Each structure stands twice: as structure tokens, then as C-alpha cells.
């Protein structure tokens, strides 16, 4: 199984600079990126303002999940190249990929993916110049 946590990058800046309708657009684009990248009946859900989770049950491995992440990032890349928006829509992603046992709760696995997502978001912030 895998759990993917995604958090839209720079939503506050988009809302504050370009208005909430553009922020809503960025959220919708993120939802579309996740939904259109699903290939095996994964569950995609918005869990908060700019936070999403994707859960895939079954036989997933790191290569399959990495392909899924590449598809999401490819969706964002194509959107950003064609949208003519003054901002980029991107998301930070964290993943748990492995097995679940009777001692592990779904919340614990989501927390693992969430922590990785925030680690990735902080790395992006440190490398960004905006």
C-alpha cells in the first residue's frame, strides 16, 4: 500500500497577490493533478485547505509510487507552461510505501507521509529565491 500526502506550495502568496479565485484555481489544479494521475483506483481526497491525501491499497512498490509522483509533477509542469498564469502551481509531496500490520493505524502511516511532505516543503523553501 501507499499513502501520499500533498500540500500546495505558496497558496497564501497566490491568494494574497492574485485573489482567492486564483487560489481556488490552484487548489482545483492540484486536485486534477492527483485525480488524473490515479491509475489503479486509488482514493484521492482533499483533507484541508491546501492539503490532499492519496491512498493506494494493494501491491505497490517504490517504482510504481515514483512513477505516480512523476505523473503529478508532469501535470503541474504542463499546466504551468500552458496556463499563462503569473504564478506556478506546485505541491510538496511525502509518501509512505509499504505494508500495514495490525499494530499500525492509518493515522500513523498518514503522519509518516505528512512528515516527509513537510520535510520536502522546507527543502523547497530553502532552495527558492522568491
What are these language model-derived features?
Residues 1-2, 9-39, 45-49, 53-54, ...:
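Conserved long alpha-helical elements within nucleotide-processing catalytic cores of c-di-GMP signaling
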Residues 20-21, 36, 58, 78, ...:
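A short linear boundary/processing microfeature
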Residues 16, 55-60, 77, 98-99:
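Residue-level recognition of strand-loop junctions within catalytic nucleotide-signaling folds
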Residues 5, 56, 93-97:
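Sensory input modules used in signal transduction
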Residues 66-73, 77, 81-84, 97-129:
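Catalytic-core segments of nucleotide cyclases and related cyclic-nucleotide turnover enzymes
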Residues 87-92:
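PAS and PAS-like sensory/regulatory domains
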Amino acid at each position: 500500500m501507499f499513502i501520499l500526502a500533498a500540500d500546495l506550495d505558496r497558496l497564501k502568496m497566490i491568494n494574497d497577490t492574485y485573489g482567492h479565485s486564483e487560489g481556488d484555481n490552484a487548489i482545483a489544479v492540484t486536485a486534477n493533478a492527483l485525480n488524473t494521475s490515479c491509475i489503479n483506483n486509488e482514493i484521492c481526497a482533499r483533507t484541508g485547505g491546501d492539503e490532499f491525501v492519496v491512498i493506494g491499497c494493494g501491491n505497490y512498490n517504490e517504482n510504481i509510487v515514483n512513477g505516480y509522483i512523476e505523473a503529478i509533477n508532469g501535470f503541474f509542469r504542463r499546466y504551468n507552461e500552458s496556463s499563462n498564469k503569473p504564478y506556478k502551481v506546485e505541491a510538496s509531496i511525502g509518501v509512505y510505501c509499504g505494508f500495514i500490520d495490525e499494530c499500525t493505524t492509518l493515522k500513523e502511516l498518514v503522519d509518516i507521509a505528512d512528515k516527509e511532505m513537510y520535510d520536502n516543503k522546507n527543502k523547497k523553501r530553502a532552495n527558492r529565491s522568491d
